[in-house]
């Protein structure tokens, strides 16, 4: 049996559900501002469900997301708030690691909008330098193209922390990134670029297993954490979308999601958890299944 790292679930959607506020383009960043302490509470609930990682609520804190909003000048302060909430939860829980989350520039699922390399590396570096001193890991999330992978590794790996590269794949063909490029082609980029693990994230559960199979050539740890959306809609691919463009799957119970996760573990995944719409109940069910199968959660 294996040692499995159990990630937390989806912070952003969990905050949306708890706050009950109408979603805005600032998404979870807005809720962190409007509801102090709610992010800490979500982190604590994921820890209580046996997650061993708290992923910072920093995915969407980029200059391009803040431009034209009342918090345009709060880039650094927002990162510090996200770190404070995660560290507070870990302290109160008594254990766990903190993963500093870095999301895509400009928009999720839009590799066509990724900036030129020089600009992208500089922007990612600015985020990574804010997060790294307070984190155990940097997790580069929803990486949708090979250029995105190269650029974010160039920005994060030199800081000296383990860097987990999390790729997002085509929901209909998990062997392909959302750019259309082959997942397998990300393996040498990750290995040569200094990544410590390759994950698949923010894709349908059904797409994760083919993606993991496409990573079979790597010597790095692999893993996955899916979302619970029916599909990524055209409306969500517009400029400055809100999550009310997306719909939760009806078959996304903790039990059914854990079924998917256990197939990934059986295929060699050693880092698992959840993305958007995966809550503490899903993580608790995964923990129960892992232990029942004799795995150790680390």
Regions found by a protein language model. Name each.
Residues 1-298:
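Domain-level signal for soluble alpha/beta catalytic cores
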């Amino acid at each position: 049996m294996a040692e499995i790292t159990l990630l937390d679930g989806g912070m952003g959607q969990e905050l949306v559900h708890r706050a009950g506020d109408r979603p805005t383009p600032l998404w979870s960043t807005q809720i962190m501002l409007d509801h102090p302490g709610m992010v800490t509470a979500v982190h604590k609930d994921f820890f209580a469900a046996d997650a061993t990682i708290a992923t910072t609520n920093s995915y969407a804190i980029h200059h391009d997301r803040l431009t034209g909003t009342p918090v345009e000048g709060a880039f650094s302060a927002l990162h510090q708030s996200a770190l404070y909430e995660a560290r507070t939860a870990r302290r109160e829980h008594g254990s766990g690691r903190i993963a500093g989350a870095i999301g895509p520039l400009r928009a999720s699922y839009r590799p066509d909008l990724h900036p030129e390399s020089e600009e992208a590396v500089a922007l990612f570096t600015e985020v990574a330098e804010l997060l790294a001193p307070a984190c155990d890991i940097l997790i580069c999330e929803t990486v949708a193209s090979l250029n995105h992978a190269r650029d974010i590794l160039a920005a994060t790996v030199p800081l000296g922390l383990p860097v987990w590269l999390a790729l997002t794949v085509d929901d209909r063909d998990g062997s392909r990134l959302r750019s259309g490029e082959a997942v397998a082609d990300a393996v040498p980029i990750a290995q040569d670029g200094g990544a410590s693990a390759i994950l698949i994230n923010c894709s349908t559960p059904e797409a994760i297993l083919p993606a993991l199979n496409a990573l079979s050539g790597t010597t790095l740890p692999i893993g996955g954490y899916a979302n619970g959306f029916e599909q990524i809609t055209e409306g969500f691919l517009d400029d400055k979308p809100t999550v009310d463009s997306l719909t939760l799957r009806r078959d996304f119970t903790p039990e059914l999601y854990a079924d998917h996760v256990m197939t990934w573990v059986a295929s060699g995944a050693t880092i698992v958890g959840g993305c958007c719409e995966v809550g503490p109940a899903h993580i608790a069910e995964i923990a129960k299944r892992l232990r029942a199968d004799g795995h150790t959660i680390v």
